A protein has these predicted regions:
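Alpha-carbonic anhydrase
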Residues: 1-175
């Protein structure tokens, strides 16, 4: 969208972003709609055995109620890429403590700025965040498709939200 707005809430251990408009994509030939976007720090998933600076989780639902999570690793790298710009338009505008939702108007802002055209992994598993139950289709992009965030935005993010508490990997697909 040329001009978009987002409702952003600091949930204490993640940022919750509700995007305007109807954002629909195809997954396995079925339309799925974005319900919200979350930003955590550091990442839930491990890349080369290590967490990345942050992880973006885009949540989708289809008409049957099935969930799809698209997970994108985020690394600290200063620059002027689309993903650097994406984070720079929202992170400096967030309240410094748990807050009621804030409406942030942004220009030239799109989730396409952080979703890579890269290889990904797919599995069916429980949600990687509380309550760590339920079942979702989960796409995880590899570290070669990582979004980049300016180091100053990462430092701000680290002061805004608590780090996730990494625990042992969740059971994948009920195995």
């Amino acid at each position: 969208n040329a001009n978009s707005s987002a409702i952003i809430s600091n949930m204490g251990d993640y940022l919750d972003i509700k995007v305007d408009g109807k954002n629909t994509v195809k997954f396995n030939a079925i339309d799925v709609t974005v319900t919200d976007v979350r930003i955590y720090q550091p990442s839930f998933h491990l890349f080369g055995g290590k967490q990345t600076a942050a992880e973006v989780v885009i949540q989708h639902k289809n008409p049957m109620g099935d969930s799809l999570l698209v997970c994108i690793p985020v690394v600290a790298k200063d620059g002027k890429s689309a993903s650097n710009s994406f984070f720079s338009k929202i992170i400096p505008n967030i309240a410094s403590e748990d807050s009621s939702p804030q409406n942030v108007n942004v220009r030239q802002w799109s989730l396409n700025d952080v979703v890579p055209s890269a290889t990904f992994y797919y599995y069916i598993g429980s949600y990687p965040y509380k309550p760590c139950s339920g079942k979702a289709n989960i796409i995880v992009f590899g570290s070669e498709g990582a979004a980049t965030m300016n180091s100053s935005d990462l430092k701000t993010l680290q002061t805004l939200i608590d780090p996730i508490k990494y625990t042992q990997a969740q059971t994948i697909g009920g195995a």
